[in-house]
């Protein structure tokens, strides 16, 4: 009679040991986040280094979290297509009128006592190294500009304008007046440009070199010029005729090396301040006091 094959207890013991230790070995794999002290954490640090790792937030669902974060960084257009959000923009630094006549020159046009936020038109200038920094602001939703002229009339003038476009941005553009028409010049001397449209006002700030290579469309600011002040509406980012028929201008040529704070009353506030009106008031008063013959 044949005898059954003899079983070796050592083989069964080895199989039993493998079954018992297999799950633990898999759980302790160094490639897994649940590894023991000899493994590496999610930041590549040894698991023995406790403390800092515990503060790292863990995603319950990596796909869901990524999708949520990705959607938060995007917005949908009216057609439903996603676009990247606009980059953050530093807030526009408020124009300081307290420095007028001290560390910068200023021109104010409008109501007596007005400032950069309430004047019909405001301009400041100051030297910064080899540049002149200009600040412009006007009560308009279109454009505000300053022209540098050899006289007080438009024509043959170098003009810097801040234009509010249809995208809500304020761009600094360079023009040259040909008669009553402003021709945009591609060569723009402006640098460090910034602008904002708030409270129905266009406000901007930019720098421009004092000395420039000889060019009929760009004047040297180290020379003195009459300053022409203008503002008006814009259509699709293009400037149109200024708001008033006779834009104000500086009474005399302006030197960028001399800081003054000059106020010019607008038409609504200069009725009784012009020499003619004052003379008329004196004549009427004298007539009333003397009486009629």
Swiss-Prot record:
Name listed for the protein in its UniProt record: DOMON domain-containing protein FRRS1L
PROSITE patterns named in the record: DOMON (PS50836)
Segments traversing the membrane: 271-291
Predominant place of localization: membrane
Location in the cell: Cell membrane; Synapse
Tissue: Expressed in adult and fetal brain. Very weak expression in medulla, spinal cord and in adult ovary.
Subunit structure: Component of the outer core of AMPAR complex. AMPAR complex consists of an inner core made of 4 pore-forming GluA/GRIA proteins (GRIA1, GRIA2, GRIA3 and GRIA4) and 4 major auxiliary subunits arranged in a twofold symmetry. One of the two pairs of distinct binding sites is occupied either by CNIH2, CNIH3 or CACNG2, CACNG3. The other harbors CACNG2, CACNG3, CACNG4, CACNG8 or GSG1L. This inner core of AMPAR complex is complemented by outer core constituents binding directly to the GluA/GRIA proteins at sites distinct from the interaction sites of the inner core constituents.
Signal peptide boundaries: 1-28
Keywords: Cell membrane, Disease variant, Epilepsy, Membrane, Signal, Synapse, Transmembrane, Transmembrane helix
